[in-house]
Amino acid sequence: YNIKKISDKNEIDNIYSNFIKLSSQKNVFCSKEILNFFFNDLDLYTICKNDKIKSFVYLFKDKNNFAISEPFIYSGIVNHPKLNMKNSRYNNEVFKINELIIDEIFSTYKNININLPPNFFDARPFLWFNYGEDNKKKFLVTPCYTSIIDIQSREPIDVFNDIDDVKRRD
């Protein structure tokens, strides 16, 4: 994966059209209009694999260059759409990308405060950052929502078939 900091405002339309608008995590706060309007107050990053955007990071900065959540209700990370990937493969890739974002981008900020959207399901990369390390920076994760996966309406064989082949063998 490679990380690119967006410094040209003209890139926003392309990123929005080819990535953000396709993601289930899109919201009004990462619309091209908002990104263009607040461009000078934002740090924007793309995380790509083989020239294909896998995640987009948008952080609003205050006058002290701290990443803050206000005035946005949601901010932080927009992950790529699942498309035809199996759930387990998609979740694993998103987990790895989010770990990379935390290690390579978020850890460079002295102070960071973001509000991830309700369909950002896996907080483990935040919880595990510097886990067990005394006197090192950590994230304070405060969920403002819960999530339930309802598999009652599905046949057990369908749930089993959605599991990645490698995980099924385990």
Model-predicted regions and their roles:
Residues 51, 118, 151-153:
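Short, flexible loop/turn elements at secondary-structure junctions
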Residues 1-7, 128-170:
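Acyltransferase donor/substrate-recognition loop-hinge adjacent to the catalytic core
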Residues 42, 74, 109-111, 144-146:
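Extracellular structured ligand-interaction cores
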Residues 35-100:
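Conserved donor-binding loop and adjoining core beta-sheet/short helix segment
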Residues 83-85, 119-122, 154:
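A short acidic, glycine/proline-enriched capping/turn motif at secondary-structure boundaries
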Residues 93-143:
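Non-catalytic accessory segments adjacent to catalytic cores
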Residues 12-52:
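An N-terminal domain-cap segment
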Residues 68-71, 88, 123-128, 159-160:
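Short, conserved acidic/polar surface loops in the N-terminal third of protein domains
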